[in-house]
C-alpha cells in the first residue's frame, strides 16, 4: 500500500497498514515541527544571535561555532520546509510518482544545503577523482565519519557527477521530513538496524538496486554508523569472539570502523555488472556528534578532501568478498591517516 501524498514505500516494499499508520503519525509531528522551528529561529534571531555569540566569546572560541551552527540550523529548517512544500505541490499536480522531478528536487536541496554549510560554517569541499567515476550502474562504498556524510555524497553524486543516487539509509533518518518524503519517492531503502529478520533487510537492499542503468549509483556506508574510537574498539572486541583472525587484521584501523559485509554483498548480488567506486574523505574527523562539531569548528576551518577511486570487480576473483572489503578499508584508513599526519 502507498500513500502517494506522503511518498511511496521504502525501496523494499515493506509498507503495510501498520507502517502507513506509523508514517502518518511521524509526519504529522515532524513536518509542522520543522516548519515552526524555521519560523521560530528566524523571529528569535535578535535573541539567540547575541546570546550564542556571548557563549562563544566567553569560551574563547574564535571560530564562533555556536553562532555558525545555529545559522546553519535556520538554513536547514527553511530548506527542509521548502522541500516538503515542493513535494506536496508535486503530489497536488499528480507528479508524486515522477522519479525525474524528485531527483531534481533532491539535487536542488543538496546543493542549497552544501551552500549553506559553506556560508555559515566555512566548510570547503575539494573533490579529486570525479572524472574517475565509471559509467553506471555504479556501486559506491562510502566512508562514514560525520553527520554530514549523506548530504555531501548526495551533492557529490547528484549535483557534481550528474548521477541518480539510490541510498541504503538507516530508518532513523525518517525523522528528517524531506528525506522521509522525497527519499521514499525515489529508489532508496531505509534499513531497520534493529530488525530480527536480516534476510528481509538484505532483500530490501537488493530490490532497491535492481533495474539500475547507466546514470544510476547505489550508495552504501559499509561501516553502518559514524566512526569514532569508542565504537571502533567496541566492534573489534565483539569481533574477536566471532572471528579472531579478522579482528586481528582490522586492528590496524586507526580512523575507520570495520566494514559490514552483508549489505555490500547484497548490492553486488543485485548489480553483478556494476562498477565499484570507493569514496573517502578527510576533514570531518570528530564531527560524529553535535558537540564534536562545535569542538572541531572552534579549532580550525573545515576543509573536506574527497577522493574517488575505482575498484575493479575482477579483483574479487578467487577471494571472499569480506577479505576484499577488509583490504580496501585498510587501504583507505592508511590514506586517511597519511593525509591527517601531513595536514
What are these regions (language model features)?
Residues 5-138, 152:
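Membrane-anchoring hydrophobic helices of lipid-metabolizing enzymes
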Residues 61-66, 162-163, 234:
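Membrane-helix interface segments
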Residues 87-109, 119, 134, 138-197:
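Catalytic core of membrane glycerolipid acyltransferases/transacylases, capturing the structured
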Residues 123, 163-165, 274:
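A structural micro-motif
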Residues 127, 167, 306-308:
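Generic preference for hydrophobic
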Residues 171-188, 213-319:
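A cross-family acyltransferase "interaction/gating" segment
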Residues 198-210:
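A Trp-anchored, charged/polar loop motif used as the substrate-binding/catalytic surface
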Residues 315-343:
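Accessory terminal regions of nucleic-acid processing enzymes
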Amino acid at each position: 500500500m502507498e500513500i502517494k501524498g506522503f511518498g511511496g514505500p521504502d525501496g523494499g516494499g515493506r509498507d503495510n497498514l501498520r507502517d502507513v499508520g506509523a508514517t502518518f503519525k511521524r509526519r504529522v509531528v515532524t513536518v509542522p515541527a520543522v516548519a515552526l522551528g524555521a519560523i521560530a529561529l528566524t523571529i528569535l534571531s535578535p535573541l539567540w544571535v547575541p546570546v550564542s555569540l556571548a557563549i562563544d566569546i566567553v569560551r574563547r572560541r574564535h571560530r564562533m561555532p555556536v553562532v555558525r551552527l545555529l545559522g546553519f540550523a535556520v538554513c536547514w529548517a527553511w530548506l527542509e520546509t521548502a522541500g516538503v512544500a515542493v513535494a506536496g505541490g508535486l503530489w497536488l499536480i499528480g507528479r508524486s510518482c515522477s522519479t525525474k522531478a524528485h531527483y531534481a528536487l533532491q539535487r536542488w536541496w543538496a546543493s542549497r544545503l552544501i551552500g549553506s554549510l559553506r556560508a555559515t560554517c566555512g566548510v570547503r569541499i575539494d573533490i579529486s577523482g570525479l572524472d574517475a567515476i565509471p559509467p553506471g550502474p555504479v556501486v559506491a562504498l562510502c566512508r562514514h565519519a560525520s553527520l554530514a556524510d549523506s548530504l555531501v555524497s548526495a551533492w557529490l553524486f547528484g549535483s557534481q557527477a550528474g548521477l541518480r543516487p539510490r541510498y541504503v539509509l538507516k530508518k532513523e533518518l525518517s525523522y528528517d521530513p524531506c528525506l522521509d518524503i522525497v527519499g521514499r519517492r525515489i529508489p532508496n531503502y531505509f534499513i531497520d538496524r534493529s530488525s530480527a529478520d536480516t534476510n528481509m533487510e538484505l532483500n530490501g537492499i537488493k530490490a532497491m538496486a535492481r533495474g539500475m542503468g547507466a546514470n544510476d549509483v547505489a550508495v552504501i556506508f559499509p561501516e553502518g554508523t559514524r566512526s569514532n574510537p569508542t565504537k571502533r574498539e567496541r566492534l573489534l572486541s565483539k569481533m574477536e569472539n566471532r572471528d579472531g583472525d579478522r579482528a586481528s587484521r582490522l586492528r590496524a584501523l586507526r580512523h575507520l570502523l570495520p566494514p559490514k559485509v552483508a549489505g555490500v554483498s547484497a548490492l553486488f548480488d543485485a548489480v553483478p555488472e556494476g562498477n565499484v567506486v570507493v569514496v573517502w574523505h578527510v576533514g570531518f574527523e570528530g564531527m560524529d556528534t553535535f558537540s564534536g562539531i562545535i569542538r572541531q569548528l572552534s579549532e580550525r576551518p573545515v576543509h573536506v578532501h574527497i577522493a574517488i577511486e575505482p575498484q575493479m570487480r575482477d579483483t574479487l576473483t578467487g577471494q571472499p568478498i569480506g577479505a576484499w572489503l577488509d583490504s580496501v578499508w585498510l587501504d583507505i584508513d592508511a590514506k586517511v591517516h597519511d593525509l591527517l599526519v601531513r595536514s
